[in-house]
């Protein structure tokens, strides 16, 4: 049993209408035929009243109505398209009584399928009939005329734009998209639970920049008659958290993995804090101590839930010479199953050190990289040929120097140029987009909506995703499980303040809830 929406069997009978073009050709036969066939083609991302009227009119002109839809790979009309994955779009059309058959067109235009299926009629919307025939429409007319088919234009008294609907108010199809993806991949919710069980005991080595995230909670003091705009607050308490690459290590450990952490620290109080924190979590820390630098600490001053000021204590000089050599020695002979480069650009990673650090990674182990663009300029493209990279949209656009392309073509370009095996592009509240191979195959990429319910603090959610996606791949569970579990964990992390370590128990509860929702329980 797969993860499809668990409706009664009779409610799912309409799925029999969805055919490959070869199956459809065998059913409708060649041209000419006794029963007339009319074909409509489009994205059908959101089926609205304009679509319904178009389909109803088309069906009135023939015996059989074939709804052809553009596959995901060729929809590049706007930022959020396609909003509904192709399998779910096909199911939506098949559920309409007026539609006899549905076919997913894997080509950029319907020309090839018109030539192959040879419908008696091909229906176009009224907006195309304005006295000027676009070149693409003329090509369709010529293809139809070559065997005796005809073009029909449907009445256009009701016209809607799916793109405008989606951009203004996107409906929540998170659960439906998840269930459709799992169904197409033959995945069950039990498979997700089993993946979590496999994480215990896996060995992962994290190499990266340590950051101490400090929160100083204050109470505002009235400025009284002060003649200067001086901000005055009273100290109440301070809370310190391990951040940066250290929190990635803690996420991995919370999932049950055996974790080694290599980093560079200053010889100061914050060094002692991070070493104690790692030991408390059961993480083996292999620090390189550089007495000439400070341990990175980023402090936020908070009063009445407002962040008044951020103060950074940091040394961004690139590591060189002895420090670089010592850091490489901490992982060169490591027996870990996977290695994570967590780059915050605070000295360890740069254009000069990355090739050297990458070369020292043990052969055959899984290689993962994440490079952040925040106060510093990391470039994910400097990590070439890795098994997994997890940039966010800003980091991807920075690496490509591309501010303008819509998401999916931009993601594909990044995937190709990075030479990686798997790209999980983080899109914030819009979820994730995953590329698993660079081709025109419709399964080359897939999307997931955000799983966050009540967002409290999204900072650090990407680190949680990175950790669980890494463990999924180390456990041999594949890109779909890696993306789903990573996205679920990121959603949970958003619901907590600070660097919260999500546990497998919390993830299991969220998976249970998702399964109930898709079963309509």
What are these regions (language model features)?
Residues 1-184:
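Nucleotidyltransferase catalytic core that binds NTPs
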Residues 336-350:
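Short acidic, glycine-rich surface-loop motifs adjacent to enzyme active sites
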Residues 179-260, 449-456, 519-521:
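Glycine-rich phosphate/adenosyl-contacting loop at the front of the ribokinase-like
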Residues 193, 338, 351-445:
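Conserved phosphate/ATP/ADP-binding segment of small-molecule kinases
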Residues 202, 230-296, 510-513:
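Substrate-binding N-lobe of the ribokinase-like
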